[in-house]
């Protein structure tokens, strides 16, 4: 099965294809989503200095907002490629987990985006559920 990791990285594209030759050149997500992914990665390169990971206040780079946008992109990729395995490297989670170097395990910052995740309406969740009632 074809696999893609959505991950911001320096000198990257915002994604990494995880299958050898099989999926090379077949990451067909459409121009608008490809451009969104590229802009997201460019913002990481331009504004996220590696030293920002050491800033516990998060004042240098908004990891939470950046990760939320990345998750939205990963969900959109999964909707476009439902047969693919899509994983997402969560920069906010990585930033948080790296606070304790004794227990830091970078693999905990990556998780799979399922079809259920991809089609979940986050606006309902933020409003307290389908009835719109706060929880």
Model regions: which residues?
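Intrinsic low-complexity, intrinsically disordered or marginally ordered coil/linker segments
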Residues: 1-135
């Amino acid at each position: 099965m074809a696999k893609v990791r959505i991950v911001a990285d320096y000198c990257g594209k915002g994604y990494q294809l995880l299958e050898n030759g099989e999926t090379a050149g077949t990451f067909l997500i459409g121009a608008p989503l490809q451009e969104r992914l590229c802009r997201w990665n460019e913002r990481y390169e331009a504004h996220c200095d590696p030293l920002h990971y050491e800033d516990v206040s998060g004042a240098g780079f908004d990891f939470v907002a950046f990760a939320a946008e990345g998750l939205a992109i990963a969900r959109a990729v999964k909707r476009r490629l439902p047969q693919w395995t899509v994983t997402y490297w969560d920069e906010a989670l990585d930033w948080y987990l790296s606070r304790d170097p004794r227990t830091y395990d970078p693999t905990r910052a990556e998780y799979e985006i399922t079809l259920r995740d991809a089609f979940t309406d986050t606006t309902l969740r933020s409003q307290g559920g389908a009835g719109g009632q706060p929880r």
